[in-house]
Amino acid sequence: MVLDGLDREAVIAAVQAAAPEVVVHQMTALAGLRSLRNPDKAFAATNELRTRGTDNLLAAATRAGTRRVIAQGYAGAGPDKPSGGRLKTEADPLDWRPIRSAVQMSAAITYVDKTVPLEAPEGIVLRYGGLYGPGVSDVLLEAVRKRQVPVIGGGTGVGSFIEITDAAAATITAVGRGAPGIYDVVDSDPARVAEWLPYLAQVAGAKPPLRVPAWLGRILAGEFVVAQMTTSRGYSNEKARKELGWEPRYPSWREGFRAWVRG
């Protein structure tokens, strides 16, 4: 069945007809995304699905008597001036001051984090790290091969990745296991941009990425991309591994990147 996730009555009717034991919310509109200069513009449709779409699915689950609702979250969109250590956990505050061009995107991500565990009797948010794999991040790979993704400002920002089939496995596990709440679904090897980007270029058989200062990066790519490359924080998967009993097939992006690019 194909329907509009923003059509409340259609969503409610479809879920009631299916009468599922679990509702899994994976609605996004990210296909073809290429530029993050203005995240609020790039993610406008996805922001709607994360807010109105989430409300529609929660209402549908209530009407259908479905207690367990699992929603896709995101571990990666951080503040412009993050505090604390190198790694974040589910216990860290959800509220932070976002980049000016990403206010709506950040609010939509936070909305899912707060609303699903609160409104659903068994509400779970799986905050995926940076997804990669065949058909998921091919745009990035193409850009890296063309040397269109530079290391900005020293590449000191820390990222957490998750291979697409590992994310799917965690989601399947959460269908039957795990207390309500938030889980960070990332691999076990958070890494600085200055580590993972040159490695991806090497695996892809490309020349090393260019390096540009932060001021030039702001002109070329925008403030959000500069923040991601210089001040972002990684995430810990300890809770997901312990409470869901989930283990990533690719505990490091290094082996995952190799399998993705060469497979």
Can you name each region flagged by the protein language model?
Residues 68, 73-74, 111-134:
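Conserved beta-loop-beta element that borders a ligand/cofactor-binding pocket
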Residues 2-52, 56:
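NAD(P)H-binding glycine-rich loop region in Rossmannoid oxidoreductase-like domains
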Residues 81-83, 110, 119-121, 132-142, ...:
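Glycine/proline-rich active-site loop of Rossmann-fold NAD(P)-dependent oxidoreductases
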Residues 168-224:
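Mid/C-terminal beta-alpha module of Rossmann-like enzyme folds, strongest
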Residues 251-263:
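Amphipathic terminal alpha-helices
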Residues 95-101, 140-162, 166:
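A conserved pocket-lining segment of Rossmann-fold NAD(P)-dependent short-chain dehydrogenase/reductase
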